[in-house]
Amino acid sequence: MSDNDTIVAQATPPGRGGVGILRISGLKAREVAETVLGKLPKPRYADYLPFKDADGSVLDQGIALWFPGPNSFTGEDVLELQGHGGPVILDLLLKRILTIPGLRIARPGEFSERAFLNDKLDLAQAEAIADLIDASSEQAARSALNSLQGAFSARVNHLVEALTHLRIYVEAAIDFPDEEIDFLSDGKIEAQLNNVIADLDAVRAEARQGSLLREGMKVVIAGRPNAGKSSLLNALAGREAAIVTDIAGTTRDVLREHIHIDGMPLHIIDTAGLREASDEVERIGIERAWQEIEQADRVLFMVDGTTTDAVDPAEIWPEFIARLPAKLPITVVRNKADITGETLGMSEVNGHALIRLSARTGEGVDVLRNHLKQSMGFDTNMEGGFLARRRHLQALEQAAEHLQQGKAQLLGAWAGELLAEELRLAQQNLSEITGEFTSDDLLGRIFSSFCIGK
């Protein structure tokens, strides 16, 4: 198998459909056109032609599109054959094409990989193709399209360019220490470094939102038995996803629901009531509940309002609060307001959001939905946003760490070489996002997750 091979793959999903598309890319795409179509179509025009077998019989007829390189998606010669979407017809046509020497089935993501290698896309844009296909909401699709059009890459490239200028300035200070210009006392290096750090912090914040939009925020409902956790899951899901009874401990295992609030994806997780386990099955359920809590982006601390008037979570259940991971956001949900007569709505107590509602009647649940949406940071128009992956967040975090270490060098003993090295490492981390600096292993992992025809 060679990267110089001409590749072919079905670009439409398997199964029956009105249209089925085969995509060919590489040096022999021209030969495929002349062999199967009997002619080379006019570039970038839709040509209605018969698709012929080796003996001249017609296998199908449809639209042929010819994109000579480098003006194509992959940067190579590309031919697309759009015929009828029956699996038998497409299979016959594919077999016909593969009889031509030098052609093979494409690997998953190989078309996008070739586009990246031929500088048609950077790595973040290539990943955005897969994210656009996998988008589970309108907002995710819009943000993926923004990434595909270069919104994320432009922000990263701006940071890389700023670091390039800063490195030039720092290395000049190192290489010409006896010059009359004092590169340190004029404050330019510190000012430029602070500007880069501020810009990077802004990109990190937006990338975290983009990651939540892509992967969804994990919200765990936790509390004592019979507090109404399963009722709240059902209210948020809009269906009877969990069994609800008056018997404490009905929920023994983790229940998951994937929902959207105004296009924002959330993974809502109902857990077993937390208490001293009465049997082995309940003990396992409680252990799993804590595992989910430790991995959560937010915890809804469910409180039965008929059992306590307290609103401060540390007063309601100090042992529970003490065991929670540090910095894990908590929303206190006082349930059964239809019984207690409490005023519905949201307030704040000791830095925690407090929401009074009735999971059984649904009163106040909309307030919780809006709160969850706002806690993701998407309470404003996000049309200019972009999607981000975990590897992007990791690269941004590492770059931020190197810049902070570099700033410490600048404000400390002025170890110029060490500052220059921290700037270089930060620049390298950022370049990994767009693929300017990356490994073959990383490329393989990224593109192998794509569809075959992409």
From Swiss-Prot:
GTP binds at residues 226-231, 245-251, 270-273, 335-338, 358-360. InterPro entries: G_TrmE, GTP-bd, GTP-bd_TrmE_N, GTPase_MnmE, MnmE_dom2, MnmE_helical, P-loop_NTPase, Small_GTP-bd. GO terms for molecular function: GTP binding; GTPase activity; metal ion binding. Its cofactor is K(+). Residues 216-377 form the TrmE-type G domain. Mg(2+) binds at residues 230, 251. Its EC number is 3.6.-.-. It comes from the Bacteria. (6S)-5-formyl-5,6,7,8-tetrahydrofolate binds at residues 23, 80, 120, 454. Binds 1 potassium ion per subunit. K(+) binds at residues 226, 245, 247, 250. It is found in: Cytoplasm. One of its GO terms (cellular component) is cytosol. Homodimer. Heterotetramer of two MnmE and two MnmG subunits. This is tRNA modification GTPase MnmE. The gene is mnmE.
